[in-house]
């Protein structure tokens, strides 16, 4: 995102950047599968992410990731879905899509609010730092 200073020395975001991002995100959203497990596989493929990379970035075991990737009947915990989103460094739009496909709906609870904060503002942070934040706000770690 390109921010340009205006004459009052305030940063103004270039609208063209948002148009481009909207086009890109919309294109991906139209092409990803309807199922939870297939959506994970598609994001991994699209991002060039291996299972080993995802395990390292998310803190989830390879076995757990494989279950998420292969089971259409899995009822994953919200924490594990959020961990996958963090591991894949998904844009919040993709994260909330994956959460919905996993059968979850974010509420106004403290836990869901903390997870939403993570997905919207901390997605590029290390999982260890994210877990420190979650501990600080009294929420289950990823």
Regions found by a protein language model. Give the residues of each.
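Long, compositionally biased
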Residues: 86-88, 112-142
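A short, Lys/Arg-rich alpha-helix, primarily the initiator
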Residues: 17-53, 127-142
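Alpha-helical residues within the helix-turn-helix
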Residues: 45, 56, 86
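Short, charged recognition helix plus adjacent turn
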Residues: 1-13, 96-125
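Short, basic-rich loop-to-helix N-cap that marks the start of a DNA-contacting helix
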Residues: 72-86
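Key DNA-contact positions within bacterial/archaeal DNA-binding proteins
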Residues: 52, 63, 93
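Recognition helix of helix-turn-helix/homeodomain-like DNA-binding domains
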Residues: 59-76, 101
């Amino acid at each position: 995102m390109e921010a340009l200073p205006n004459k009052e020395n305030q940063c103004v975001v270039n609208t063209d950047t948002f148009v481009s991002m909207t086009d890109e995100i919309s294109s991906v959203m139209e092409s990803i599968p309807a199922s939870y497990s297939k959506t994970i596989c598609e994001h991994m493929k699209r991002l060039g992410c291996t299972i080993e990379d995802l395990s390292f970035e998310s803190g989830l075991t390879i076995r757990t990731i494989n279950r998420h990737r292969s089971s259409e009947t899995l009822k994953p915990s919200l924490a594990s879905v959020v961990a996958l989103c963090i591991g894949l460094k998904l844009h919040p739009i993709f994260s909330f899509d994956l959460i919905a496909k996993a059968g979850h709906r974010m509420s106004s609870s403290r836990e869901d609010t903390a997870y939403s904060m993570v997905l919207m503002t901390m997605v590029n942070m290390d999982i260890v730092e994210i877990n420190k934040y979650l501990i600080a706000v009294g929420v289950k770690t990823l």
